[in-house]
């Protein structure tokens, strides 16, 4: 099975280990990975900031880059959601709306692809300790992926998963929201860190690097002892 990887900006610039783990897990599951070097940003930051025309240019480029893929997989619920929003963005342009729908229909978040397409629930990972899961807003509320991460983590050998209190609450990242509304964002991420600490977990695990960078940065500044990991890193662990 051929999988075309959309690596995302944050993985490319800050968390390359997540990209590596994503590839290694998928290859271990029998996938052949393709990586189009022409890929750029999905356009979400510009679109959410109101720069619609600039965002559309990036989106058109991404549609052209990925439309011939068999499956498109990304280690980000947020960016996968943006791909699924493309048809709505181009709803008044039939030509691009059709091409956008073609891309959206074969785009999957990493864990969603493993569980729903590959029909795998145990990837053979092992990681001793206690974990709690942060469920990102776009991934759960817009993409509708709520169960796949927990299903996969429940089968990681040695790992105990505890529910995160107030799991439905945003971590305060929200892309440019954390920059434009910093005091509010800081309060939100403080509450998220407090919730994570309540669980007594060794690891806070999520599927979006934006959230994890935000939460992890706050944990570091507060001097808390809990390790933040992307789920691809966990599923690639053989501890």
From Swiss-Prot:
One of its GO terms (cellular component) is cytosol. InterPro entries: Cys_rich_dom (IPR004017), LutA (IPR022822). One of its GO terms (biological process) is lactate metabolic process. GO terms for molecular function: oxidoreductase activity. It holds the Pfam family CCG. Belongs to the LutA/YkgE family. Is involved in L-lactate degradation and allows cells to grow with lactate as the sole carbon source. This is Lactate utilization protein A 1.
